[in-house]
Amino acid sequence: MRLEGRVAIVTGAAHGIGRAICVELAREGAAVWACDVRAAELEGTRAAVESVAPGACRTAVVDVRDAAAVGAFVARVDAASGRIDGLVNTAGGVAGQVMRPVEEVPDADWREIFAVNLDGAFHFTRAAAPLMKRAGRGAIVNISSGAGRSYSLTGIQAYASAKAGLIGFTRQTARELGRHGIRVNSVAPGFIRSNPASERQWDAMGADGQARLVESIALHRLGTPEEIARAVVFFVSDDAAFVTGQTTSVDGGQWMLG
């Protein structure tokens, strides 16, 4: 197993892509600390991990927007485990918002999406970096989006902008932390039916819109949360020991960006 003895934190772990990441990390031998704001759904994640790796998952309710809560959680993981080898910043989403003309977007809605999608990754990276520096190694993976590399199918300006910011944050921290043996990369999923928000978006497309979306993907199908998770495992593992500062699209060839 590629991650035997490693300890990893996964944010946004209550369902969908975050849950799949927890399962795949544990399958490869990692001890996983899963956090989210949804306590009940976190129990589902714990059960999913337990089914493949008994005893490999601990959960905690943490709001990534709350810097103090993030710092306390990271300190708790360090106290219990003595190390943090991997950090996967999955928390994100559109915060229940829908597309509106840019002139109608309130400041509070703009900031809310940035708080979840970008500030949260900053809070966790800031808290975990000293511990990884102490160890002389570490791997951080930020879950961005095709929206951050092109545009958002949701039409939500703040979402595309925050995900683009997360890609920039990935590059900058990779440059800064590389001398300490810490790698920072990003995985940019395409459209994945992984949670209630993506299901609502899928339903809103209608049959014709769904067909057009699938037709735009080179592999002519949607991806799965597990396929995103396997890319994350690669970046956390030593298979990616000489890879940092990169954003990899896992979208079935929808965008094919250089």
Range-by-range predicted roles:
Residues 178, 183, 243-245:
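Short, small/polar-rich loop/turn modules that mediate ligand/substrate recognition or access, typified
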Residues 98-102, 106-114, 202, 213:
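Substrate-binding pocket helix/loop in short-chain dehydrogenase/reductase
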Residues 179, 191-217, 257-258:
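A glycine/serine/threonine-rich, flexible loop-to-helix segment
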Residues 3-33:
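Canonical Rossmann dinucleotide-binding motif of NAD(H)/NADP(H)-dependent dehydrogenases/reductases
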Residues 125, 162, 170:
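Active-site helix of classical SDR
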Residues 130, 149, 175-176, 241:
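Alpha-helical segment proximal to the catalytic Tyr-Lys
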Residues 94, 99, 233, 244-258:
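Short C-terminal tail/terminal secondary-structure segment
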